[in-house]
Amino acid sequence: MDNFLALTLSGTTPRVTQGKGAGFRWRWLGHGLLELTPDAPVDRALILSAGIHGNETAPVEMLDKLLSALYSGSLTLTWRMLVVLGNPQALAAGIRYCHSDMNRMFGGRWQSFAESDETRRARELELSLETFFSSGQARVRWHLDLHTAIRGSHHLRFGVLPQRDRPWETDFLAWLGAAGLEALVFHQAPGGTFTHFSSEHFGALSCTLELGKALPFGQNDLTQFNVTSQALSALLSGVETSTSSSPPLRYRVVSQITRHSDKFALYMDAQTLNFTAFAKGTLLAEEGDKRVTVTHDVEYVLFPNPSVACGLRAGLMLERLP
């Protein structure tokens, strides 16, 4: 199965749907779904996903290279792993999504969206994770969901972690730093993301990794993600990564800006970078007689997007943690 990406993009089902790799067995579970199981018993399970948004291609190309290394035998697999290419139709079309943003739909939230290929795919992915985790006895469960951002950023690579009732494990956070993430953002409330779903329902240590800017297939400079790719290779093969000399900065979400109607106005232009700072009292958005202002001494914006559909998030405001 060394043509997983090509088969997924073409919508083709392989003639052979299971087989042997170099020290592991593989099974094609459907378009964009591939399970790899080491021959030796392991107690670790990993979801490695990309392409939830179809225009975010660099992580997909990274996963393709990792799979090639596994199949060639140059990389050893020490995790039971499910590889997910989230939105095959959008990936093939080179667009963010075909109908609705799938990364708002998980945890059953797809039921509140108009039925579409994305709602059906979100449900399929939920079931795939349930089957994957229930069919093993993994002591350690990780989920790394690889993305790229629409906008530029003051931090080229950063991670967004879902709300979690328990403390984060230090080795997981340390690995994120070793993977080159310059900042970590901690959600304080539940959400419809893929990583929140895997964390809430299966207890996985989950993170959305934002790796640069969204570009079409073939236009990505993957060398700028070498540190992340090397950390992933080390993770898969069970090699300990060295601790980052510059630990990621930490932020927490303090508020969400939501667009409710066509009267909504976000006072940030297209050049506003992720993690741009705003001083206390700054007017961020207006909608009718409602005004959104900065309430802390300094807040930082993440994912500003004035053109989202009504009812969806138009941005997050963050506070820097000590």
Curated annotation (Swiss-Prot):
The keyword Ribonucleoprotein does not apply. Its cofactor is Zn(2+). GO terms for molecular function: hydrolase activity, acting on ester bonds; succinylglutamate desuccinylase activity; zinc ion binding. InterPro entries: AspA/AstE_fam (IPR050178), AstE_AspA_cat (IPR055438), Aste_AspA_hybrid_dom (IPR007036), SuccinylGlu_desuccinylase (IPR016681). Gene3D superfamilies: Zn peptidases. Keywords: Arginine metabolism, Hydrolase, Metal-binding, Zinc. The active site is at E210. CDD domains: M14_ASTE. It is an enzyme of class 3 (hydrolase). It comes from the Bacteria. Pathway: Amino-acid degradation; L-arginine degradation via AST pathway; L-glutamate and succinate from L-arginine: step 5/5. This is Succinylglutamate desuccinylase. It comes from Salmonella agona (strain SL483).
